Amino acid sequence: MFTLKKSMLLLFFLGTISLSLCEEERSADEDDGEKEVKRGIFSLIKTAAKFVGKNLLKQAGKAGMEHLACKANNQC
C-alpha cells in the first residue's frame, strides 16, 4: 500500500510539472501570435499608405503636366 501511494504521488507531481510546462509553452505561443498579428496590421497599413501615396503622386503629376502643357500653348 505504501509503494502504491508513493507511485501515485510521483505520477501526480510529474503530471503537474508537465501540465505547467505545457501552459508556459501555450502562453509563449499566444504571445508570438499577437506579435504576428501586429506585424500583419503594420504591413497592411504600410502597403495601403504606399498605394495611396502613389495614386496621389500620379494625380499631382497629371495635373502638373496638364498645367505645363496649358502654359506652353498659352491656353490657360
Swiss-Prot record:
One of its GO terms (biological process) is killing of cells of another organism. It is found in: Secreted. The keyword Disulfide bond applies. InterPro entries: Antimicrobial_frog_2 (IPR012521), Frog_antimicrobial_propeptide (IPR004275). Expressed by the skin glands. The keyword Signal applies. Belongs to the frog skin active peptide (FSAP) family. Esculentin subfamily. This is Esculentin-2MT2. The lineage of its organism: Eukaryota, Metazoa, Chordata, Craniata, Vertebrata.
